[in-house]
Amino acid sequence: MREWINQSKIDLLAKEIGEENVPILVNIFLGELNDYQSKLVSDTVADKLGYLKEISHALKSSAASFGADRLCAKAVELDSRAKSGEMMDISLEVEHMLELLKQTHQCYSDLVH
């Protein structure tokens, strides 16, 4: 689990907002991760690349705030590649993002439950 959670970020967050508030915010983060996973696999999202860009931009901030360093690194990478116009294998990137979202969700869920 340590490889998925940057504990120093969680400790800093606890210091800033109070330890008792960390589970509340982590649960909000977990909901965000669930939403992203659901929409990435949904047939209602026709533009997977556009949605991947959208969530990558959002995850740069939220994943960094919660110390989800692996997820943050992937979000930064995808956001940068999208902005540079680099071609991507969309199905591969969606699959990789889904795996990162799933693993991150599991680790943070274990942290607060």
Swiss-Prot record:
Give the HPt domain ranges. Answer: 18-113
The gene that this protein is the product of is luxU
Give the GO biological process terms: phosphorelay signal transduction system
Which InterPro entries does the record match to this protein?
Answer: HPT_dom_sf, QS_phosphorelay_intermediate, Sig_transdc_His_kin_Hpt_dom
The protein's job, in short, is: Phosphorelay protein which receives sensory signals from a sensory kinase and transmit them to LuxO. At low cell density, a phosphoryl group is transferred from the sensory kinase, probably on His-57 and this phosphoryl group is further transferred to LuxO.
User: Which Gene3D superfamilies does UniProt cross-reference here?
Assistant: HPT domain (1.20.120.160)
Quaternary structure annotation from Swiss-Prot or TrEMBL: Monomer.
Q: Which residues carry this modification: Phosphohistidine?
A: 57
Pfam families, per the entry: Hpt
This chain's protein is named Phosphorelay protein LuxU
Which GO molecular function annotations are given, in alphabetical order? protein kinase activity
Q: What are the disulfide bonds?
A: none
- Transmembrane stretches, start-end: none
UniProt keywords (A-Z) are: Phosphoprotein, Two-component regulatory system
